[in-house]
Amino acid sequence: MSLDKRDLEKVHVELPKLVDQLKEGKLDRRDFLRTSTRLGLTASAAYALAGLPEPVQEAQAATMGGTVRISMRVIKIENPPIYDYVYDSNIARQVCDYLTRTGSDNVTRPSLLEKWQASDDLKTWTLTVKKGIKWSNGDELNADHVVWNLTRWLDEKVGSSIIGLFKGFLVVDYDTGQKDAAGKAKMGTKLYSDKAIEKVDEYTIRLNGQTAQLAIPENLFHYPAVILHPKDNGVLGVGSIGTGAFTLTEFELGKKAVLKRRDGYWGKAAALDEVQFIDNGDDPAAAIAALASGQVDGMMEASTSQYAALQKIPNVVIHQVTTGQTGVARMQEDKEIFKDPRIRKAMRLAIDCRKVLQIAHLGLGAPAEHHHVAPVHPEYYKLSFMQQNIAEAKKLLAEAGKPDGFDCEIFCKKDPDWEAIAVGSMVNMWKQIGVNVKMNVLPSAQYWDHWMVEPLAFTNWTHRPLGVMVLDLAYRTGVPWNESHYSNPKLDDLLTKADATLDVEKRRQVMKDIEELMQEEGPIVQPLWRAVFTGMNKKVKGFKMHPTSYLFAEEWSL
């Protein structure tokens, strides 16, 4: 690669240092790719400097046309910023696009953006919109559209989880002047300044942060961060305006969604005429039957109970990828039963994570360590493995005033079925320390009514390319997706420090403190990391299993 130090410094002052660390063996190729592209180096240049060939999308089949049908839950899609699962976003992303895209290789590239540029201190990010992108109504995408979306995402009235990714950087807490039932001040969130999101010109937006933030490109691909046309007033549905390769022509909640290829797409024209998402319900056997009979051509994602059956279906290929997908039994620390951190740690020590992985996920993945940072994350720090320790768990319960244990209830979903299997295996292990947990297995649609309410519940969390992302989303004080109601100023400060630390090795040292804090005082029992897989008919070309189970139908053909 012919880029010299001056060329690299024009992109970002830290890039020459990254190249040196790569050459000296202090930074592996994977971390170099992720970090250099985050600073604005093109993926092609980063791969070349790393001495690797860039992954190439499989060429489209010569024949255009046809329909691909995917088995996937069809849930509400009206308000993308408050999406809380991948299903809804997989419909939206065929109609609308994101500013960036993190590929199956975990490298983030511009999508609706032409490029981004970070200031030396990572406090200012300049986003440049691609010129000439047309919405389906003929309007050209511009900076005003992007500013409208960014501002809406960070409006506390909308209630988007995106706030958690920008907390401290663009968003701050403020006292609303109201009191809660306990007499404590009710806090809200707002942009720290009316200059936080700045339109520079017709195609340029500047994010003026008050703290450093390294993960802006990845944060812009958080699945609720769909770019909508302001004329649709924030509502996505049949006939909505989009920049994507398809138009939503039919939507029936809980049954199906139909999308048709549109003319005028700014990227490479999609090969397929139509994509259909078919809802086969909670029963894993129904999706397998649909795939085996040819009613569908593939599944968004398969569960472990379907694995053996998938292997037996003719003309079906199993696609698999290592991920940071997981499930956590989160304990709400503001509920009396889980206020004492010793009780929360005892719940962790009761679990044999390797056994849960084998029982619930056929051993496909890795045992987790109760801190929600995965081995696939660049900043993961390898601690001594947290082994099951029944005696220590009982001792902690006794110290917390529960020498005979206690009774409680855990809520979980029926689909995907591995979740209830994992919970069942943990329930049996908790019995060994005198904690009797009743399982309440709900239909998936009903679970989300209990998600933020119950003291103990098991929630599936999807993959994120950086460990700091999921921690910011789930455990920062007051963020919308903080299902455990966890509030720890020390963790908040450590996350702010990690978010501002570009150097992977230095960030890993910060993450060590975070991981230890989560194991000692945190609000979760986390048994496993999942390898994600699915089955797809061989006739579907161009499909790649994404670690977040995202689907990109414009890449497929027959």
Can you say where each PLM-predicted feature lies in the sequence?
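N-terminal lobe/hinge region of extracytoplasmic solute-binding protein
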Residues: 71-120, 239-243
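Periplasmic binding protein-like
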Residues: 70, 138, 301, 422, ...
